[in-house]
Design a protein with these regions (language model features):
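Domain-level signal for soluble alpha/beta catalytic cores
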Residues: 1-205
Length: 205
């Protein structure tokens, strides 16, 4: 038995924090091309900050074809809906398949983690979070602030979205401990968390 499992990130294939409305076949090809390359080197795929049930379904089925389980990372807005307008429960009930090993709220503020946990608990699946520390609760899609051409330097997200300075490593620990006490078994940090935050919560395992 391994003490450490390696996750392979399958992120949103068009833009971050935004539903991908492209043709399903195009999305599937993008996911498959990436998954095929990294698949041999990972234990499972992490569906990394996905904004609609359709994308989750496509990526889950790609992983199934490659015989890999998936940790599903749903991005949520302040209203606890995905950017597509779907609820967590709707996506779970419609698209869950046998290779889902867990469900997390992905790249969301600690406040959104807390407000969405009551719905996730009811789904009877291992759950948790990867919390961000952006300066705003609802980060905007990258393409809205980064319009650089391939030969230009793009806008730094730290400048466009800002960074919270009110969540110390100790506060991140306290927040994570509270979520763990509510049943979460998957704890992590996302954008703008740093090694100090992760070191602090590592004692919660």
């Amino acid at each position: 038995k391994k003490d450490i499992l390696i996750a392979g990130s399958l992120p949103a294939q068009d833009d971050t924090y935004l539903e991908d409305k492209r043709n399903s076949k195009l999305i599937e090809k993008d996911f498959y091309d990436q998954a095929k390359i990294i698949g041999p080197y990972v234990d499972f795929f992490y569906l990394d900050v996905i904004s609609s049930g359709r994308e989750i379904d496509i990526a889950s089925n790609v992983a199934l074809k490659l015989s890999k389980p998936v940790l599903v990372g749903m991005h949520l807005k302040k209203n606890n809906l995905l950017p597509s307008g779907e609820t967590i429960s709707e996506v779970f009930q419609k698209y869950k398949n046998n290779n889902w090993i867990g469900l997390i709220s992905a790249c969301v503020s600690p406040e959104i983690v807390e407000s969405s946990i009551s719905e996730i608990i009811k789904l009877n699946i291992p759950f948790g979070f990867k919390a961000n520390l952006w300066g705003i609760d609802e980060p905007t899609p990258v393409k809205t602030f980064n319009t650089a051409k391939p030969n230009e330097i793009g806008t730094n997200p730290n400048i466009a979205l800002g960074k919270r300075n009110d969540i110390s490593a100790k506060k991140f620990y306290d927040f994570s401990k509270k979520i763990k006490e509510n049943g979460a078994t998957i704890l992590g940090g996302c954008c703008e968390t740093n090694p100090n935050h992760i070191r602090e919560i590592s004692s919660l395992k």
